[in-house]
Amino acid sequence: MKTGSVEAGEQASEDATPRRGKKLNRGILILDLVLRVFGAICTLGSAVAMGTTSQTLPSSSQFFRFRAKYNDLPMFMFFAIANSIVCAYLVLSLRLSIFHIIRSAGIITRIILVTFDMVMLVLLTCGASAATSIVYLAHKGNASANWLPFCVRFSHFCNRISGSLIGSFFSIIIFMLLVILSAVSQFSICN
């Protein structure tokens, strides 16, 4: 039976819960900062790899030159621009992420940040999916449309654009983790 006073064990567990929640929230915010840095590196690498991709085939004739550049296809240009925009956003959002670590009370700015995270996730996914369809056609071709695969001849070009896609898909996974971390962080603040 309980008496009027609170037992020592119950009081200690009640005091430990807010501290544990603050430490968990601070850990989530630090992980958010680290993921933003890695996401910026991945998107910057993808944009640079795509933007500097070109290959010219050697030819025996002076009149014919076969060249493949990323800006020959609008999907690759959209991919490079989308990755550049997302990289700029991630660099700019680092300031807010550091602010949240220092002052964890900024709920409105967290909601704004997760909203922009979702918008950037959609933009990055659109760019990566558009470029993926063209990379698939470059590697496999399409027999019914009589499109031959050109990665047999432009292997360096195709390797660079494929590597660029890998970096972009890593960034998509990072953005998914950022949105999940934001939801967990909001839940821990509310409770």
Swiss-Prot record:
Indicate whether Transmembrane appears among the record's keywords. yes
InterPro entries cross-referenced by the UniProt entry: CASP/CASPL, CASP_dom, CASPL
Q: Which GO terms describe its cellular component?
A: plasma membrane
Q: In this UniProt entry, which residues form the Extracellular topological domain(s)?
A: 49-72, 132-160
Q: Does the keyword DNA-binding apply?
A: no
Q: Which domain of life is it from?
A: Eukaryota
Topology in the lipid bilayer is annotated as:
Multi-pass membrane protein
The protein's UniProt keywords, in alphabetical order, are: Cell membrane, Cell wall biogenesis/degradation, Glycoprotein, Membrane, Transmembrane, Transmembrane helix
Any idea what job this protein has?
Regulates membrane-cell wall junctions and localized cell wall deposition. Required for establishment of the Casparian strip membrane domain (CSD) and the subsequent formation of Casparian strips, a cell wall modification of the root endodermis that determines an apoplastic barrier between the intraorganismal apoplasm and the extraorganismal apoplasm and prevents lateral diffusion.
Q: What is this protein called?
A: Casparian strip membrane protein 4
| Organism whose genome encodes this protein | Ricinus communis
